[in-house]
């Protein structure tokens, strides 16, 4: 008799995705981040659901409802901090996952890659709206500053901003709709993640060498299920260490002050995972130019498959490209640092140089470098 997992319509899908899936025999720990992102999404949805049971999306009570969760709800503090720091873990995994894709040339699976970019935008939108919900000073002013950027769109900008606000400023209507969107988006993300996997399983996984691995495949279970389980253990350990020992390490103290439209914080800045994009936005003196650069800083990932000029897929055997890749990583870390600094000398010029280098590396240096490496192959 055939095993039920191979015949049952629902079990069959799970079987082909997670059990009998042929996987390359040599994929490294860098391939763990897909499953870790799934775990992060699961943690965020579960903790978020429990938070939503006690949260009120009203300007008068939002801040005190979060305080109530932390003080009066059983284990509310750990749920709240797991949700807040879970977002940080989510973005750490996201950045490493995208970095892996760039390094090993996984972007040549263009459908999977493009769905991934959509996922990145969706997660960023969700995180932004979630940051507004506690209705602290940074929540309010962050929402005001970022939504205001849409006013840079010619002709319809101002109307668009007021439409999103539901009034003439960030107020009760804005908070309520942000809560609604923050609740629904993770489920859209989960659906997109399934499409992401669907496209990935059409082609099969890439591997560190970038060479087609059809000749040497192994079953996903037990080899990669146990490997993923180890990754889960690491992630949960790191998350719990952060939550239990230093829950406010990555937060902003200003957000423990209730939102006050009459008092602007000295430095309005987003959470750490948006600082690189915020630095790019600030590095351009023109408002519309800044917004354009902000969107392009992520959207530029979509042109990576078109800019792949190398005869090899992976950077594993391309030392010059590797150097440029690590310069790009260092550049992003520099941008993250600059995003958290005040707008004054020398931070302004450093931010402008780092922003220029970011686009110049991806659009010019890396493709040219790949062409040079192609020539070196003929020696």
UniProtKB/Swiss-Prot annotation:
GO CC, alphabetical: mitochondrial inner membrane; respiratory chain complex III
Top-rank lineage group of the source organism: Eukaryota
Membrane topology of this protein: Multi-pass membrane protein
GO molecular function list: metal ion binding; ubiquinol-cytochrome-c reductase activity
Subunit structure: The cytochrome bc1 complex contains 11 subunits: 3 respiratory subunits (MT-CYB, CYC1 and UQCRFS1), 2 core proteins (UQCRC1 and UQCRC2) and 6 low-molecular weight proteins (UQCRH/QCR6, UQCRB/QCR7, UQCRQ/QCR8, UQCR10/QCR9, UQCR11/QCR10 and a cleavage product of UQCRFS1). This cytochrome bc1 complex then forms a dimer.
Family per similarity comment: Belongs to the cytochrome b family.
Protein name: Cytochrome b
Species in which this protein is naturally found: Ochotona forresti (Forrest's pika)
Phylogenetic lineage: Eukaryota, Metazoa, Chordata, Craniata, Vertebrata
